[in-house]
UniProtKB/Swiss-Prot annotation:
Binds to and probably activated by a virus-derived, approximately 400 nucleotide RNA (called CBASS-activating bacteriophage RNA, cabRNA) that begins in the viral terminase subunit terS and extends into terL, as well as by a shorter RNA with part of the cabRNA sequence able to form a hairpin. RNA secondary and/or tertiary structure, as well as viral infection itself, are important for CdnE activation. Belongs to the CD-NTase family. E01 subfamily. It comes from Staphylococcus haemolyticus. GO terms for molecular function: metal ion binding; nucleotide binding; nucleotidyltransferase activity; RNA binding. Keywords: Antiviral defense, Magnesium, Metal-binding, Nucleotide-binding, Nucleotidyltransferase, RNA-binding, Transferase. The gene is cdnE. This is Cyclic nucleotide synthase CdnE01.
């Protein structure tokens, strides 16, 4: 047996979008208001990331990821620059005085003032805000520039933009590329006759069922990892109208290619999907996820 096409078509549908957008706008209004503790608040870039930004959210999703990016300063990686380029870089920029930790504390104080301290919880990677309908995971960060070239003029400088922040417990740095993730997801969706994102929603709903049945835990796979896993599946496997046939073919491809996980990349195309960093998945959990999907599929 396989999961009926009618059920898969329902699972492929997108959940609510307006309320998360309203929540983002509310948080932006709070952080940019005159009462805000943030310095240079006119240089903030506040945007959705994750499922709601990428249009892969499903019914019943409640966590809204909101990036609060300060462009007043930035982190950078200049390891790919030539010696003469690094010299120009060092002569161009001064050491920042408004550090990320000061920025994060200013964001926390402002959110606590606006929403009440009891509704603001400081997590390891984000600041959680509890509202009546949704939970917002606010991520204070600076821009991260991965420089590819650096000359005397702006025209001679090229970098890949991302974000960087640190964990609360150990102060470990996390670098990610949410805007790249979004752009490449849109491109793949267009190349696959707009079946890529609905298929992601199907896999997210299957994950939801697996957790409900206690076959896996939430820690085994995140929504981000599901998107990046499916990003590695060749486009032709998504270009199938019938959802049952499409999911079956994709699942078969993933099962046959588990030995190639080391070559898989994240949807942002800036790092490998599997590894030991905070931003990467481990192959054991991915194997478990695929095994349980196959079992769930065959037992339906």
């Amino acid at each position: 047996m396989t999961i009926p096409t009618k059920k898969l078509d329902y699972w492929s549908q997108k959940g609510a979008t307006q309320a998360p957008k309203n929540l983002r706008e509310k948080i932006e209004k709070v952080l940019t208001a005159n009462e805000s503790k943030i310095k240079r608040k006119n240089q903030l870039d506040i945007y959705l990331q994750g499922s709601y930004r990428n249009n892969t959210n499903i019914f019943g999703s409640s966590d809204v990821d909101i990036v609060v990016q300060s462009n007043a300063t930035f982190f950078s990686n200049i390891s790919k620059l030539e010696a003469y380029e690094r010299k120009i870089y060092n002569q161009t920029f001064d050491e920042a005085t408004y550090t990320w930790r000061y920025f994060k504390n200013d964001v926390i104080k402002t959110l606590q003032y606006a929403f009440g301290s009891s509704n603001v919880e400081i997590g390891n990677k984000s600041i959680k805000i509890f509202t009546e309908d949704y939970e917002a995971d606010v991520i204070p960060c600076f821009e991260h520039r991965n420089y590819l070239s650096f000359g005397n003029s702006e025209e001679d400088r090229e970098y890949i933009p991302g974000i960087k922040f640190f964990t609360t417990d150990k102060g470990e740095s996390i670098i990610n590329y949410p805007k790249k993730h979004y752009v490449f997801g849109v491109d793949k969706n267009e190349r696959t006759n707009n079946y890529y994102k609905p298929t992601i929603r199907i896999f997210k709903n299957i994950k939801k069922q697996l957790i409900k049945q206690k076959r896996i835990t939430k820690k085994v796979v995140s929504s981000y990892f599901i998107e990046s896993l499916l990003y590695n599946v060749p486009d032709r496997y998504f270009c199938i109208d019938n959802a049952s046939n499409r999911v079956a073919d994709i699942l078969n491809w993933l099962t046959k290619n588990q030995d190639s996980f080391s070559t898989f990349i994240c949807q942002n195309e800036q790092m490998n999907l599997f590894g030991s960093s905070q931003e990467q998945w481990n192959e054991e959990d991915a194997d478990k996820f695929i095994f349980e999907i196959n079992k769930f599929w065959n037992e339906w």
